[in-house]
A protein has these predicted regions:
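Switch/connector loops and helix/strand junctions flanking conserved nucleotide-binding motifs
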Residues: 8, 67-72
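Hydrophobic helices that insert into or interface with lipid environments
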Residues: 24, 154-156
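Short glycine/serine/proline-enriched coil/turn segments at secondary-structure junctions
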Residues: 6-8, 24, 36-38, 53, ...
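Flexible, surface-exposed loop regions and adjacent strand-edge segments
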Residues: 74-83, 139-148
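Long, internal scaffold/assembly segments composed of regular secondary structure
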Residues: 156-166, 170-172
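Transmembrane beta-barrel wall of Gram-negative outer-membrane proteins
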Residues: 38-66, 78-133, 158, 164
Length: 172
């Protein structure tokens, strides 16, 4: 169908316009889930606004973890065979549990600022911290097994957010 240009001129078949909540209320959202392969996911998000002063504080965070220790089986249809030494110098086909394939990631962002002031619709400073860790057992092909290879990283991202409608002139 016809799509307004502000949603994307090349949209084929339609578009979905997601309008996020501008966050004018206090809230606390928390979640936790547990799944197979010792998978854990947690999130905590909160916001507090002082209506009189316009001062607000936000916290957003999540943490994910998984052992990824699922069973791997041979699959002749795709010429995929898992072979392990049998102790006599031979290789035998066998189902094996993955090892050294752990994954974890986390993020926390804290923001403080002012809303609805004569000099700013929004003025806020924030700091974001993110970390991740991933172990690798194999590459793209299961035939090459690595020994204790992992990837990890951290980063910090400070930011300043400012918004003022009709800045210096109406409509700007």
């Amino acid at each position: 169908g016809v799509v307004p240009a502000e949603l994307g001129a090349d949209a084929l078949g339609g578009a979905i316009n997601l309008v996020t909540d501008k966050g004018t209320q206090d809230f606390l959202d928390a979640s936790y889930s547990f799944g197979s392969f010792n998978t854990h996911r947690a999130a905590l998000n909160t916001q507090v606004i002082n209506k009189r002063t316009g001062l607000f504080m936000k916290l957003a965070s999540f943490y994910n973890y998984s052992d990824n220790n699922y069973w791997m089986h041979s699959n002749p249809k795709y010429d995929a065979a898992i072979q392990v030494p049998d102790g006599n110098g031979n290789f035998v086909e066998k189902s094996v549990r993955r090892f050294h394939d752990q994954y974890q990631s986390g993020m926390i962002q804290a923001e403080v600022g002012f809303l609805n002031k004569s000099w700013a619709d929004v003025l806020a400073i924030s700091m974001l911290y993110n970390q991740h860790y991933k172990e690798y057992q194999t590459g793209a092909r299961q035939s090459v097994v690595y020994g204790h290879v992992n990837r990890n990283g951290k980063y910090y991202m400070p930011s300043i957010r400012y918004k003022k409608s009709d800045f210096l002139t109406e409509g700007l």
